[in-house]
Regions:
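Transmembrane alpha-helices and adjacent helix-loop boundaries
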Residues: 1-339
Length: 339
């Protein structure tokens, strides 16, 4: 039971980072990134190959860039790889005046091609067999039991999630975040307001890709293995549904979506005993997630926690909202006296 709870909490932390990265791109900037899973996967792969060590004649795995870097360098390399890939793809795709629906299709094609290339080419990351034997950070120093190490990872991941959440919230509530909202609502108007839309889209795409790669690096360091089966392009759909159900443009809502969709309907059923024919439980997971998304789409399109209204006041200007509230209270008082 303890392993069940600790593993579920680890996945909750990973999915929290995942939804925050996608919420930056999709919720705040309006970029439909159907290739999001590629960034998480490249972070996992590069964190893995920089932790395992170089390939030798006795190795049972083949991969590129094999080295054994000291922790936390593998996490840094994995995060940087996601940022570099996002910069390349963002420059190619987002710098052109391509409609958002075409961008979504292009990124989906990129995810499918990347999966096929990594699976078919054994020399990259050991092909369809994937990578295994990835050392877990701190495990050789702390000498904890398996259960103890899992709970240690839960605590460490909680600290990371709090830091990332505070950083993302600070970005989204700053003037930079307001520019993202303006770009999402009307790019033409944002351009006339002096916002460089192309640069802004590229920057938020890089930040989101880096956070996604960081989540993949953290996950592979915990699992100790990674294979192409772990990053099918349909995994992007789960994160999208979590952001949409929780509330796009709201980081707390995105976290709630991560708790509901990937963890409750994704992680929990994997620990339940098998019933029916083989594969029935996994099939029902997708059915429930799809039905949950449809219900949200029809009955609460803004999500469980919708994006709040943003009232901005410049320094030296009167507080219009407080003036309105005082005027409204005065009118109510006059009406009550008249009665």
């Amino acid at each position: 039971m303890q392993d069940f709870v600790s593993i579920s909490l680890v996945y909750l932390g990973i999915y929290a980072l995942s939804v925050w990265s996608l919420n930056l791109q999709f919720g705040y900037a309006g970029i439909i990134n159907f290739g999001w899973i590629v960034f998480q996967s490249i972070g996992a792969y590069f964190a893995a190959v920089t932790s395992i060590g170089p390939v030798t004649s006795h190795s049972y795995q083949t991969y590129i860039f094999g080295s054994r870097l000291a922790f936390p360098l593998p996490l840094i390399v994995g995060t940087a790889s996601g940022a570099v890939l996002a910069a390349i793809l963002g420059y190619v795709v987002l710098s052109r005046k391509i409609r958002s629906d075409f961008v979504a299709v292009i990124m989906l094609v990129v995810a499918i091609i990347a999966l096929q290339v990594v699976t078919a080419n054994v020399s990259l990351f050991n092909g369809a067999n994937g990578l295994s034997g990835i050392p877990q950070p701190f495990n050789g120093i702390l000498h904890l039991s398996q259960s103890g190490y899992q709970w240690f990872y839960v605590g460490w991941l909680t600290v990371i999630c709090v830091i990332v959440y505070l950083g993302v919230e600070w970005l989204c509530k700053s003037s930079w975040g307001r520019s993202l909202r303006a770009m999402r609502e009307d790019e033409v108007l944002a351009t006339h307001l002096g916002i460089n839309v192309q640069v802004l889209r590229l920057v938020v795409f890089i930040i989101g890709g880096a956070i996604a790669a960081f989540s993949g690096a953290l996950l592979v360091e915990f699992l100790g293995a990674w294979s192409p089966d772990a990053w099918s392009f349909v995994e992007t759909f789960v994160v999208f549904v979590a952001v949409y159900i929780g509330g796009r443009g709201n980081n707390r809502g995105a976290f709630l979506g991560a708790l509901l969709v990937p963890v409750i309907f994704g992680v929990f059923p994997s620990f339940l005993p098998a019933f029916g024919y083989p594969g029935l439980s996994s099939t029902l997971q997708w059915v429930v997630i799809a039905l949950l998304w449809l219900c949200t789409f029809y009955f609460r399109p803004a999500g469980i926690m919708p994006e709040g209204r943003l009232i901005v006041q410049r320094e030296g200007q009167p507080d219009v909202s407080s003036m309105f509230r005082r005027g409204w209270a005065a009118r109510r008082a006059q009406r009550s006296e008249a009665r």
